[in-house]
Amino acid sequence: MKTPHKCRVPGLNIGCTSFIIPDYYVPAIRECVHYADDIALLLLEAGEHGEGLITPAEIRELAGIAADAGVKWNVHLPTDGGFATEESGRRYTENIIRAIDLTRELEPHTWVMHVVTDHIPGPDMRPHLTERETERILRSLEQITPHLPAPECLALENLERHPTDYLDKLVSATPHSRCFDIGHVWKEGLRPEELLPLWLPDIRMCHLHGLEKRDHKSLHHMAAATLDAILHPMW
């Protein structure tokens, strides 16, 4: 029998992603529940019409595993889409809705969404959203909202190579929340503790990961003072 070694910090709910080991959803989650009280179910690739998403049978099995282990869920929505055109925005919105409807059975506290015009990473800083892009995204969010248990359950994530105020108009114009990706801010050479007081009223959850040549690495790569600067204000 595996001895649990859950990461717990007073005052914070610590989680992990659904793939701390390279395996399919069900065996991977069976491993995750030994280490965290909150699991981010990664549904990053939906495909053209949702064919790449997790199956309803897998969702039912994950619900049982989580209930037995007493863990909670958040869901990272598909990232293989964007709002570059009306057509791409329509397809992306449909897949976001598919993913939300599929995972409602898990009763996630948050669904995390990327808001991009081009989902293929590039080396340059993205420009601010145009008025037309903003209107397109707001229409999409209006379509997504009825599928949520509450509007604030949808959290828009800040991304690297995007201006820090990229999401400001969207957050202020909707009842949705922020997912504060701290690692993305570090990756841009900025100080997340300076953004925290500005964004805190809208933050629903945070992504915390280290940097070592790239992001999404162990926090062991980060200096203690760097971690303290952002974590202490949260306590």
Residue ranges and their predicted role:
Residues 23-26, 163-167, 227:
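Short, well-ordered alpha-helical microsegments
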Residues 59-76, 135-148, 227-235:
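Alpha-helix-loop-beta-strand connector modules within alpha/beta enzyme cores
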Residues 17-21, 42-46, 78-82, 116-118, ...:
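Active-site beta-loop-alpha junctions enriched in small/polar residues
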Residues 67, 84-177:
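Active-site acidic/histidine proton-transfer and metal-coordination neighborhood
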Residues 9-14, 35-38, 67-73, 106-109, ...:
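Short, well-ordered coil/turn segments that N-cap beta-strands
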Residues 53-60, 89-97, 130-138, 190-198, ...:
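Charged helix-capping and loop-helix junction motifs
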Residues 1-98:
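N-terminal pre-domain/capping segments
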Residues 39, 140-223:
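Acidic/histidine-rich catalytic cores of soluble enzymes
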